[in-house]
């Protein structure tokens, strides 16, 4: 058994222990909650180390076996793309288990059940990314959907709560139906369920089939992303679920959909039509603008963060669309930069969204509310949480020195490069409009950040906050790790690029943080030799 097998087997074993032991032996175990948390932390560390090693060493780990009948093939593979998203899953799961240790007080059965399910939920998230065939992928995808549905309803049994939970379940299964259709079409064309047989099918499939696959993947994974108009489950689910559950859903679960889109568009389909890229850009800007407009209007921190997720997933879609556009024009260096933006913002969003929900959880444990009308002057009683929340909303609003600023800069740079490359005046006008709308989205995000931080933490302290304390060290550790990560990612993006450079190079060309200059071709109007450098070049 090699190094990777030991680590990922350890991840599986610790997860199973964290799920089954506290649940089955609750009455005989006084510390069932502690066992669930410790197992979750151990499993996350194993997955984190394994995924990091695969990514840095540019290696591939794979395993295949058979269970019950031959069609149920356990095909597991970790390439650079899977390793990157496994890093997100395991790092945020690690933070979440640390936070949950402080958030769920007592050894009562309800807390033990929730933590046991969180272990299983974390396994399903990893399973989606580890799967190397369509059947196993759909199995873990459905497992992820059902467990998240149960966890969302965990604290609420009212008719309205059930209705909102079922809305989430319906939309997520609508997405599953389209993903299943895409995999069925791939099976009909290849006669295989293995992902290895789907690689670069864009070179052999006809145009109609490719377009159907593109649309099915976008709707299927878009439902989980929460892009417009499939975003309606976000405020409903986020408003219902326990904070520790929603923190994991918002930071990690929707990234499995980003992974799915990357796997389909860059791995399976390979070649792309020009309209795909522009359609993704248009879908992304609509989602981003609609999401941030609704986010700014909210007077509840949970709902603000829910709608801002639609905005941030829109940003990722725009970057993905730009990568496809540049790839269509065979501008691999520009496509590489756009793809890097997808990866960077995926990690950035996972960090700050997890941080903000955890900060919200800290507030909720003290005041039992996240309505802005009931929150005032919390910085006087919760200075540590105030600093952490400020760091989170600064990254959300793309303000330096945090990672969000780098994400915004990279996106704007991608759009400027597309503007200089295009010669069609209509397309250039559309890019200019997109640039303006992206800047508008950024401005509205700043307004939302100021509103939520200003109302909750500044001003006169509300009477209910007079007894607030910040003595929970589990909260401080989880918040501090995420703030430090956002700051390091914002100050040293070149190190992040060094880690994911092999992944970018697998699809396009390597990026250099020392001397990368992108030359706009002669066809780009009067600008023949305009050199644009990365901000860390």
Role assignments for model-derived ranges:
Residues 95-112, 118-137, 147-470:
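Hydrophobic transmembrane alpha-helices and their helix-loop junctions in integral membrane proteins
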Residues 377-387, 441-537:
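Cytoplasmic/organellar membrane-interface segments at the starts of transmembrane helices
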Residues 2-10, 74-88, 127-139, 275-276, ...:
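Membrane-entry segments of alpha-helical transmembrane domains in multi-pass membrane proteins
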Residues 76-90, 207-222, 425-442, 518-537:
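Hydrophobic alpha-helical transmembrane segments
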Residues 38-52, 173-183, 389-401, 478-500:
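Hydrophobic alpha-helical membrane-insertion segments
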Residues 142:
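Short phosphate-coordinating micro-motif centered on Lys-Gly-acidic
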Residues 1-9, 18-116, 192-203, 502, ...:
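Transmembrane helix-loop-helix hairpins at membrane boundaries of multipass inner-membrane proteins
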Residues 61-70, 196-201, 410-425, 496-527:
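Membrane-interfacial helical/loop segments at transmembrane boundaries in membrane proteins
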């Amino acid at each position: 058994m090699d190094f990777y097998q030991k680590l990922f087997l350890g991840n599986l074993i610790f997860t199973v222990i964290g799920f089954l032991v506290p649940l089955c032996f609750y009455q005989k175990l006084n510390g069932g909650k502690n066992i669930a948390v410790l197992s979750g932390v151990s499993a996350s560390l194993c997955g984190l180390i394994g995924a990091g090693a695969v990514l840095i060493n540019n290696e591939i780990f794979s395993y295949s076996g058979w269970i019950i009948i031959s069609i149920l093939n356990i095909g597991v593979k970790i390439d650079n793309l899977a390793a990157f998203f496994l890093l997100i899953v395991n790092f945020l799961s690690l933070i979440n288990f640390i936070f949950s240790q402080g958030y769920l007080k007592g050894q009562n059965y309800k807390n033990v059940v929730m933590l046991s399910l969180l272990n299983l939920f974390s396994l399903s998230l990893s399973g989606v990314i580890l799967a190397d065939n369509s059947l196993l992928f759909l199995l873990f995808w459905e497992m992820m959907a059902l467990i998240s549905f149960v966890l969302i309803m965990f604290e609420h049994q009212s008719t309205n709560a059930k209705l909102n939970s079922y809305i989430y379940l319906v939309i997520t299964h609508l997405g599953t139906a389209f993903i299943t259709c895409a995999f069925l079409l791939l099976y009909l064309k290849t006669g295989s369920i293995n992902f290895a047989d789907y690689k670069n099918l864009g070179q052999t499939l006809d145009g109609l089939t490719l377009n159907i696959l593109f649309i099915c993947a976008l709707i299927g994974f878009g439902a989980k992303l929460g892009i417009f108009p499939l975003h309606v489950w976000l405020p409903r689910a986020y408003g219902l679920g326990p904070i520790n559950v929603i923190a994991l859903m918002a930071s990690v679960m929707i990234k499995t959909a980003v992974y799915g889109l990357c796997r389909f568009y860059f791995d399976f389909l390979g070649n792309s039509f020009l309209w795909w890229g522009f359609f993704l850009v248009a879908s992304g800007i609509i989602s981003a603008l609609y999401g941030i407009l609704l986010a700014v209007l909210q007077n509840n921190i949970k709902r603000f963060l829910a709608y801002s997720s639609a905005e941030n997933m829109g940003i990722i879609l725009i970057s993905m669309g730009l990568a496809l556009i540049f790839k269509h024009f065979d501008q691999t260096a520009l496509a590489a930069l756009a793809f890097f933006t997808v990866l960077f913002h995926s990690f950035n969003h996972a960090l700050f969204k997890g941080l903000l929900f955890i900060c919200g959880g800290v507030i909720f444990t003290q005041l039992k509310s996240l309505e802005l009308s009931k929150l005032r002057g919390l910085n006087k009683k919760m200075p540590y949480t105030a600093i952490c929340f400020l760091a989170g909303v600064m990254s959300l609003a793309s303000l330096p020195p945090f990672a969000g600023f780098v994400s915004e800069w990279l996106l704007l740079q991608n759009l400027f490069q597309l503007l200089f490359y295009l010669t069609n005046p209509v397309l250039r006008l559309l890019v200019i409009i997109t640039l303006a709308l992206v800047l508008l989205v950024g401005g509205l995000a700043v307004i939302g950040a100021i509103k939520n931080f200003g109302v909750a933490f500044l001003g006169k302290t509300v009477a209910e906050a007079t007894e607030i304390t910040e003595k929970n060290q589990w909260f401080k550790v989880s918040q501090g790790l995420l703030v430090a990560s956002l700051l390091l990612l914002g100050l040293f993006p070149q190190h992040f690029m060094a880690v994911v450079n092999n992944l970018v190079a697998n699809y396009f060309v390597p990026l250099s943080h020392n001397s990368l200059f992108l030359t706009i071709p002669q066809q780009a109007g009067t600008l023949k030799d305009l050199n644009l450098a990365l901000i860390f070049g």
